[in-house]
Amino acid sequence: MEKRNVLFVMSSLRNGGAERSLVNLLQLLDYDRYNVDLLLFQNEGMFLKQVPKAVNIISNCNKLYTLYDNNKAEALKHPYLSAIHMIGTFISRKKTNSVAKSRQYRWEHFYKKIVPELTKEYDVAIAYMQREQTYFLVDKVKAAKKIAWVHNEYSQLGHFKEMDLEYFEKVDKVVTISDLCAKDLKENFPSIAEKFVVLPNLTSSQVIRSLAKEFYPPEFKRDMLNIVSIGRLNAQKGFEFALDAALELKKSKVSFIGLF
């Protein structure tokens, strides 16, 4: 059987739910069936070491790396690109009223013009994060099928809808992580509602069990229930529900420790 060529495009592999989900997906793929390339806008992150060895991490996109990397040494190597990054970022923020919109503007008016296309052609190409990864997928990748991913409730992202609609129309499917997120996308883009599909963030039980055996943190209490909540401290993550649950446990006289 001829192996299919697949590309994943991602911002980085720093700590985050989308990053963890991507690594889990890569660990579940059958590499006897797929040749997999991974393109990172920033070739870094705590999950890099967990990427399967069968995955080819593309490492020759110097223009892309310089535009998205804050490394001063890299900036000195490529002063022209560094200048575009600084000027483009400054003008984009002046032209818009949010970080999200400024990054959309920066891609459309600055980065899109100088980031080169990938030369390799793919059977399937996947932008595993919304915004610039999706724009790169549409503008710079040749693939028979293109899939975009939205890992948040779209209405909370603060994007220019008109720009995203233009790009969503050019992909085959837009995957999101919950029925609520899909409903929100369909309400924002009713003309392409059939493109939105749901695939919850993937977890690997094998990886979780392996990591659990590595060590016990000093905060771990063997004689009580340990509850760990991980995430950004903002309204979207809903940490107030964890506090409500902790109160109920206390009322029920359950011995526990809560860690945030």
Specify the residue positions occupied by each region the protein language model found.
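A conserved mid-protein helix/loop that constitutes part of the nucleotide-sugar donor-binding site
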Residues: E19-N24, L225, S229-E248
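Glycosyltransferase donor-sugar binding loop
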Residues: L39-G45, I230, S255-F260
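A short, active-site helix/loop in glycosyltransferases that binds the activated sugar's phosphate group
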Residues: T134-F136, D172-V197, T203-S205
